[in-house]
Amino acid sequence: MRTRFAPSPTGFLHLGGARTALFSWAFARHHQGVFVLRIEDTDVERSTPEAVQAILDSMDWLGMQPDEGPFYQMKRMDRYAEVLAGMLEAGTAYHCYCSPEEVDAMREAARAKGLKPRYDGTWRPEPGKTLPPVPADRKPVIRFRNPIDGATSWNDMVKGPISFDNGELDDLIIARPDGTPTYNFCVVVDDWDMGITHVLRGDDHVNNTPRQINILRALGATLPEYGHVPMILGPDGEKLSKRHGAVNVMEYDAQGYLPEAMVNYLARLGWSHGDDELFTREQLVEWFDTRHLSKSASQWDPKKLNWVNAHYIKGMDDAELAGRVAPRVERRGGKPQAADLPAIMGLLKDRAETLEQLAEDAMLFCGEYQPAPAELAAQHLTETARAALADFAARARDTEWNRAAISALIKAVLADRGLKMPQLGIPLRVAVTGRAQTPAVDAVLELLGKETVLARLQAL
């Protein structure tokens, strides 16, 4: 088995493309096959090196390294020219000298008759047919001589049997007047040369498939199997777009989503394994079967993605999680190396949905101390609270500094002063962290360290 992913580098890798790549990658891995990456960069005006790199970075982040490639179409122009010449010689392609305006007029005339708009075959050679004079000042396009009779059918791996009447398929342009080949032609030659056996792609390509099948047949090539995956919709049921939030895969990296979570969530958009919502990359490969790909569109759900990401954060080893969060802390001006970041992760991760949230919360321990705003201090640092804090500080100097001992000390101060937990817990937080809300106060004090805690209490 040989599958492929063939993006156009005219922008970032979007979520729909990433999911298609994931399905093709998992399909190949499941069958111990080969996953090929091909960059379809023939749109010279819109293709950029930055977009190519963004695609490669996204696939690397998701862990979908190709077995072969990336191959670039712009480096295969000689091969396309060779195949075009062979098709012209074999009569499966021909030169067409119609201007774009003439073709538009043909289509309008067909519409006026209630027919499907199409090229009328003016330059298509037929036995006994006299072709028009060749214009002296016009370069021709090359058209594929599509079969007129019968139908082109295939058993789609996702949608089931699909058939197109050949009479409704006009003769496709496969090379422009400047000689550059078109998308549908390059795809066919690439799939043929690269021995692609299975093509999984978005269902916006369904109408291209009969044309590509007919070109492959004209070349005498073995046909791959095709599967067309429905699109991803936004939460409102409309086609997923920028107005629904981020659609660039790498934006999710920047926002603090784990690649493990992204792979898990993307796979569940249009594929299922029973009722399993959470699974590893290895389980995806083991379980992947095109029979379990959905025929209907999937809906993007940011809340579900957050839930999946939180699951992976919670289950990750504290030291590994610290390694992923540390650069995000540093970007905020924090000093992760000055704190016990793995222990901090252990304290914070159960509440976090993203690495960015973790990094922000970790600044409590790794960032510069910001005293409480005056209004917050006035609300919580009352005379009663300050007396209790002074008592706590005095006793703390001789207390072993671990969570259990700190908890016991807090309880002792509460008992001796007849206070309830919020009457000391909140003032402690405000005085030591500048915030009224933090994780468990005894754990926070332990991680900040005795010296830091006493210094901040002394400064009141």
Swiss-Prot record:
Entry keyword set: Aminoacyl-tRNA synthetase, ATP-binding, Cytoplasm, Ligase, Nucleotide-binding, Protein biosynthesis
InterPro entries assigned to the protein according to its UniProt record, in alphabetical order: aa-tRNA-synth_I_cd-bd, aa-tRNA-synth_I_codon-bd_sub2, aa-tRNA-synth_I_CS, aa_tRNA-synth_I_cd-bd_sf, Glu-tRNA-ligase_bac/mito, Glu/Gln-tRNA-synth, Glu/Gln-tRNA-synth_Ib_cat-dom, GluQ/Sye
Region (Disordered): 118-138
Residues bound to ATP: 242
Gene Ontology BP term (one): glutamyl-tRNA aminoacylation
Reactions performed catalytically: tRNA(Glu) + L-glutamate + ATP = L-glutamyl-tRNA(Glu) + AMP + diphosphate
GO cellular component terms listed in the entry, alphabetical order: cytosol
Biased composition (Basic and acidic residues): 118-127
Function, as annotated: Catalyzes the attachment of glutamate to tRNA(Glu) in a two-step reaction: glutamate is first activated by ATP to form Glu-AMP and then transferred to the acceptor end of tRNA(Glu).
Family: Belongs to the class-I aminoacyl-tRNA synthetase family. Glutamate--tRNA ligase type 1 subfamily.
UniProt-listed HAMAP family: Glu_tRNA_synth_type1
PANTHER family referenced in this protein's UniProt entry, alphabetically: GLUTAMATE--TRNA LIGASE, GLUTAMATE--TRNA LIGASE, MITOCHONDRIAL-RELATED
Subunit field text: Monomer.
Protein name from the UniProt record: Glutamate--tRNA ligase
Source organism: Bordetella pertussis (strain Tohama I / ATCC BAA-589 / NCTC 13251)
Phylogenetic lineage: Bacteria, Pseudomonadati, Pseudomonadota, Betaproteobacteria, Burkholderiales
